[in-house]
Curated annotation (Swiss-Prot):
Annotated source species: Caulobacter vibrioides (strain ATCC 19089 / CIP 103742 / CB 15) (Caulobacter crescentus)
Protein name (Swiss-Prot/TrEMBL): N-(5'-phosphoribosyl)anthranilate isomerase
InterPro entries to which the protein is assigned, alphabetical: Aldolase_TIM, PRAI_dom, RibuloseP-bd_barrel, TrpF_fam
HAMAP family cross-referenced by the UniProt entry: PRAI
Superkingdom to which the source organism belongs: Bacteria
Length: 219
């Protein structure tokens, strides 16, 4: 698939109903989490069943991981067969290159952000990652690298130029995503907890509302 330069990613999907809501709302990316500490964690075999109805229908599927080992990469590619793998840990540029080569698909590299110096880290992944993602730095002691509802100063991304399409993530919801897009100038947005009624419980109505808000912001 070609590199998407605009749109929204709904992350942490786990039911047929929420996958349908994301697809019907024209989400560009559907994210499935493979991290056992997350309330959104699903087995690769479950994700494979969830993506089957939308496979090849113009949406990119994303396997979201944290410092994945080769065994997990192999299992994901043998079952879910995602279009992209997202890495949300302490992966180095060389490790991201290894993952991309092993999987044979592009990689989204996520960065935890609280200052402009954190945004600067992206330069080291030039030519390595297919997409970049800037997420809020989790509070100290959190076991989750993302999906916490925390947000950072969107203005840190304003006017920045990157060699790859980039996502804004962290604390987005149907009510603030329009402002976030306007302030940051970011072409891609990612949401997880902002479309939930409880930890890991995605709400189809909130997914639809979020995607509608993204469309309005880009009109």
């Amino acid at each position: 698939m070609s590199i998407s330069a605009h749109g929204a990613k709904i992350c942490g999907l786990s039911t047929p109903e929420t996958v349908k809501a994301a697809f019907d709302g024209a989400a560009a990316f559907l994210g499935f989490v493979f991290f056992d500490k997350s309330p959104r964690n699903v087995a690769p075999e479950v994700a494979a069943r969830l993506v089957e109805p939308v496979r090849g229908r113009g949406v990119q599927t994303v396997a979201v991981t944290v410092d994945p080992d080769d065994a997990l990469i192999d299992r994901l590619m043998a079952t879910m067969r995602p279009d992209l793998i997202q890495v949300h840990g302490k992966e180095t540029p060389s490790r991201v290159r290894e993952i991309a080569a092993r999987a044979g698909v592009g990689v989204i590299k996520a960065f935890s952000v609280s200052s402009s110096a954190d945004v600067d880290q992206a330069a080291a992944f030039d030519g390595v990652a297919q997409h970049l993602m800037f997420d809020a730095r989790p509070v100290e002691g959190s076991v989750l690298p993302g999906g916490t509802g925390a947000r950072f100063d969107w203005g840190l991304l304003a006017g920045r130029r990157f060699s790859r399409p980039h996502f804004l993530a962290g604390g987005l919801d149907p009510w603030n995503v329009g402002e976030a897009i306007k302030t940051s100038g970011t072409p891609l947005v990612d949401v997880s907890s902002g479309v939930e009624r409880g930890p890991g419980l995605k709400d189809p109505a909130l997914i639809s509302a979020f995607l509608d808000a993204v469309k309005r912001a880009k009109d």
